[in-house]
From Swiss-Prot:
Gene3D superfamilies documented for this protein: Cytochrome Bc1 Complex, Chain C
Cofactors: heme b
Protein name: Cytochrome b
TM helices/strands, residue ranges: 33-53, 77-98, 113-133, 178-198, 226-246, 288-308, 320-340, 347-367
Organism for this UniProt entry: Cephalopachus bancanus (Western tarsier)
Record family assignment: Belongs to the cytochrome b family.
Topology versus the membrane: Multi-pass membrane protein
GO cellular component, one term: mitochondrial inner membrane
Keywords assigned: Electron transport, Heme, Iron, Membrane, Metal-binding, Mitochondrion, Mitochondrion inner membrane, Respiratory chain, Transmembrane, Transmembrane helix, Transport, Ubiquinone
Length: 379
């Protein structure tokens, strides 16, 4: 009898995607993050659904409904902190997944890479809107500051901001629509993930060597399912340690104060995973220039395939490029630190220097280094 998983129309799709999928035999632990992101997305949708059952998207009751979830709902505190810290884990995995793509040259799969960038933008938008929902001080002022950046767009900026707000300030209409979008966007992310996987399975996975692995493939199950379960166990250990011992470590104390429009917090800052982009935004004194730099800091990923001048795909055998890659990582960590600091000396100059180095590294230093390495191969 023919195996059901190979003949049933639905099971066949799952089989080709997760069971009999031919995978390169040499892919390392850096290839775990795709499946971990899938787990994070599932966790966020499930915990978010349970939170939505008790949350009210009204400015008068939003803050107290979150308090009610934490105090009165059975395991409400656990669901809330799993959701909040799950977002942090999601972004940690996202950054490592993108970093892996940069290091091993996975961006040469253009469709997969571009869908990935679209996914990154969508997840960032979802996270931003989710941060507004508890309606604490940082929620309100974060929403005000970030949405107000759109007013820098010539001609239509102010009208666009008022249209997003649903009035002349961040208020009830803003909160209601942010909740609606925050609920629907994860399902759009899920659809995009399916397209991302569809394009990936057209070409097959990349591998650390960067060369074709068609001659040496092994089935995804059991080899990589077991490997991914180890990654999942480590992720859950980190997440549960955060949730059960340091639930508020990555949050902001100001968000435990209900939103108060007349009173501005001393330092307005977003969640930690947006701080690198926020630091780039703040490093430019001009408002429109800052907004453009903010957008370019993510959009720059889309032009990386065009900047690839090396004859080798992966950085595994390119030590100079490896140095620049780890400089870029250090740079992003510096920007993340600066984004959380007040706007004063010496943080201003450090932020400006790190921002210049970020763009300089990707746009000029990396392509030049690739050309030098090509010449070194001939020597």
């Amino acid at each position: 009898m023919t195996n059901l998983r190979k003949t049933h129309p639905l099971m066949k799709i799952i089989n080709h995607s997760f069971i009999d999928l031919p995978a390169p035999s040499n892919i390392s632990a850096w290839w775990n993050f795709g499946s971990l992101l899938g787990v994070c997305l599932g966790l966020q949708i499930v915990t978010g659904l349970f939170l939505a059952m008790h949350y009210t998207s009204d400015t008068m009751t939003a803050f107290s409904s979150v308090t009610h979830i934490c105090r009165d709902v059975n395991y409400g505190w656990l669901i809330r902190y799993l959701h909040a810290n799950g977002a942090s884990m999601f972004f940690m995995c996202l950054f490592m997944h993108v970093g892996r793509g940069l290091y091993y040259g996975s961006y040469t799969f253009l469709e997969t890479w571009n869908i990935g960038i679209l996914l990154l933008f969508t997840v960032m938008a979802t996270a931003f809107m989710g941060y507004v929902l508890p309606w604490g001080q940082m929620s309100f002022w974060g929403a005000t500051v970030i949405t107000n950046l759109l007013s820098a767009i010539p001609y239509i900026g102010i009208n666009l901001v008022e249209w997003i707000w649903g009035g002349f300030s961040v208020d009830k209409a803003t909160l209601t629509r942010f909740f609606a979008f925050h609920f629907i966007l994860p399902f759009m992310v899920t659809a995009l993930v399916m397209v991302h996987l569809l394009f990936l399975h057209e070409t097959g996975s990349n591998n650390p060597s960067g060369i074709s692995s068609d001659t040496d493939k092994i089935p995804f199950h059991p080899y990589f399912t077991i490997k991914d379960i180890l990654g999942l166990a480590i992720l859950m250990l980190f997440l549960m340690t955060l949730v059960l011992f340091m639930a508020d470590l990555l949050g902001d104390p100001d968000n435990y104060t209900p939103a108060n429009p007349p009173k501005t917090p001393p330092h307005i800052k977003p969640e930690w995973y947006f701080l690198f982009a926020y630091a780039i935004l703040r490093s430019i004194p001009n408002k429109l220039g800052g907004v453009l730099a903010l957008m370019l800091s993510i959009l720059i990923l889309a032009i990386i395939p065009m900047l690839h001048t090396s004859k080798q795909r992966s950085m595994s055998f390119r030590p100079l490029s490896q140095c620049l890659f780890w400089m870029l990582v250090a740079n992003l960590l510096t920007l993340t630190w600066i984004g959380g600091q007040p706007v004063q000396h010496p943080f201003i100059i450090i932020g400006q220097t790190a921002s210049i180095l970020y763009f300089l590294n990707i746009l000029i230093l990396m392509p030049l280094t690739n050309i030098i390495e090509n010449k070194m191969i001939k020597w």
